[in-house]
């Protein structure tokens, strides 16, 4: 399986990581180059999306770096978006930006995505996981691209924002499978809704006979620790009890200190749940 970034917004480069302070006025711009300080003395950072200032409105929330930094939009002028820092934090290079509840008018498949997919097709990838699928049309565009390039690879739709939840059933019907990508989903939606969204997604996939993957933060603590938390064990157990077809690791095995132990742990929990189901039957 190969991940395809999809419509993603990121900050640009900054000379060095700096701390945003609560209550600070801060600007997002497009085309300003490396971040720094504007003529009015307000610190700023560039974004990679020219339509950024057109998609959002005064009062909207801007989340940076997986929601660790929160800002509120105060004013918009041309390509400049002025914000107030609500939750402070360190800002480094190329941090991911989330705009909860905002429809982002980026293409479903960017030029960079097409180049990445071409490499995947040449390598014989079986599945492409398309990030930030918003509606069935996004999948139709991707299916056509694969067909035009003589690929029979299947598409896994990653649901990661409110628009995807609204169009959930239609997205599942148009895809070859679904991934509940809980990282961005937990940022874009109220966190208390996340378990309900996961259950609804799994149940809908079962009804439509489509495979479903539950992913992200399965064993997050094991990036640094050799043992899982009790909450993580219960989370994995419940995902399998709800009849998810797959549970997937990410950061745990890419940057974690205990990648093999993570695989062994999640497998052990899955097998225990399956033995319990067999005993009940």
Residue ranges of model-derived segments:
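Non-catalytic helical/linker scaffolds that mediate oligomerization, partner binding
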Residues: 1-281
């Amino acid at each position: 399986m190969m991940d395809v970034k999809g419509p993603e917004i990121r900050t640009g480069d900054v000379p060095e990581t700096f701390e945003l302070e609560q209550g600070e006025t801060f600007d997002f711009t497009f085309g300003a180059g490396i971040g720094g300080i504007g003529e009015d003395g307000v610190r700023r950072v560039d974004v990679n999306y020219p339509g950024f200032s057109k998609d959002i409105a005064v009062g909207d929330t801007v989340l940076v770096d997986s929601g660790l930094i929160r800002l509120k939009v105060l004013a918009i002028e041309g390509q400049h978006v002025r914000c107030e820092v609500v939750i402070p934090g360190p800002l480094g290079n190329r941090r991911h930006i989330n705009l909860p509840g905002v429809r982002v008018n980026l293409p479903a498949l960017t030029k960079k995505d097409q180049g990445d997919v071409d490499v995947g097709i040449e390598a014989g990838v079986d599945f492409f996981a398309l990030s930030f699928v918003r509606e069935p049309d996004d999948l139709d565009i991707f299916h056509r691209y694969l067909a035009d390039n003589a690929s029979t690879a299947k598409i896994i739709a990653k649901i990661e924002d409110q628009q995807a939840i609204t169009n959930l059933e239609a997205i599942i019907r148009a895809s070859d499978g679904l991934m509940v990508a809980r990282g961005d989903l937990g940022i874009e939606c109220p966190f208390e809704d996340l378990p309900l969204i996961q259950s609804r997604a799994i149940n809908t996939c079962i009804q439509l006979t489509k495979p479903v993957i539950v992913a992200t933060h399965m064993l997050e603590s094991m990036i640094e620790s050799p043992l899982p938390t009790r909450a993580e064990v219960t989370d994995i157990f419940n995902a399998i009890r709800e009849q998810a077809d797959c549970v997937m690791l990410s950061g745990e095995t890419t940057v974690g200190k205990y990648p093999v132990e993570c695989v062994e742990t999640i497998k052990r929990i899955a097998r225990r749940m399956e033995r319990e189901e067999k005993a009940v039957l």
